[in-house]
A protein has these predicted regions:
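H-loop (His-switch) and adjacent beta-strand-loop-beta switch element
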Residues: 212-225
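ABC family nucleotide-binding domain
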Residues: 2-215
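ABC-family P-loop ATPase nucleotide-binding domain
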Residues: 1-11, 222-251
Length: 251
């Protein structure tokens, strides 16, 4: 299995003021899946995405990425995993405003120590993939919102990630631009085989994904989602679960 989460919990704070954002979540994601992670604000979906992207750590439980225990990695090792295998797309684009599209896409490759000529070649190829061939010398602050998100996608795929995390990728876009972005993500998944997890609250955008997982109050809500998307419970993946409220899913 590509990704396995076993009885994952996340608690912020201590004592009476502690808040449990995740309450024993178990989930499997197969290689090549395109999963929409849905739920209301405060349901735990963003916390779950941060853990999957190695941007945060679980309080307890086990996270296996390609059979590697992420919980057992130190901070530097998690950073290496994130840098080499995971791509990120954010709602706010997170581009350098006065930097060209090409330079923005090159940035993660620069951090990986790739030579300039090779960086530019990969960045140009990535921009072409998202329909921005010929736009490489435009600064990002001169681009439309849809174009900026395309640059962000090109940057995310430039390092050829195994796993792409998209956090509300259409949140700042109108319907037309949102559909364009979703078609690109769908193409990356179906044609390039990139496994994608997308956080969204929009059911219209979730329809582009192949599977849905709904969160509610720190657990997977098994009463929602498409038939066959959520199977089993936490005992399927973690027999020693001690949290009676734990929910689980299998994609």
């Amino acid at each position: 299995m590509f990704i396995q989460l076993k009885n994952i919990t996340k608690t912020y704070g201590e004592g009476e003021g502690a808040f449990r954002a995740l309450k024993g979540v178990s989930l499997e994601i197969a290689k090549g899946d395109f999963v929409a992670l849905m739920g209301p604000s405060g349901s735990g979906k963003s916390t779950m995405a941060n853990i999957l992207g190695c941007l945060d750590s679980a309080t307890s439980g086990e996270y296996l990425f390609e059979n590697v225990s992420v919980q057992a990695l130190n901070r530097n090792e998690r950073a290496l995993l994130r840098r080499h295998f995971i791509g990120f797309i954010f709602q706010g684009f997170n581009l350098l405003p006065r930097t060209t599209a090409l330079e923005n896409v090159e940035l993660p490759l620069l951090y990986r120590g790739i030579a300039r000529a090779e960086r530019q070649k990969i960045a140009l190829e990535s921009l072409k993939m998202v329909g921005l061939d010929g736009w490489e010398n435009h600064t990002s602050n001169k681009l439309s919102g849809g174009q900026q998100q395309r640059v962000a996608i090109a940057r995310a795929i430039a390092s050829k990630p195994l796993f792409l995390l998209a956090d509300e990728p259409t949140g700042n876009l109108d319907t037309k631009r949102s559909v364009e972005i979703m078609k690109i993500l769908q193409w990356l998944n179906k044609d390039l085989g990139i496994t994608i997890l997308m956080v969204t609250h929009e059911s219209e955008m979730a329809a582009f994904a192949s599977k849905e997982v709904h969160f509610l109050d720190g657990n997977i809500d098994k009463t929602k989602g498409r038939k066959g998307d959520i199977l089993g419970d936490s005992s399927d993946l973690c027999a020693d679960s001690s949290d009676s409220t734990a929910q689980g899913g299998k994609i």
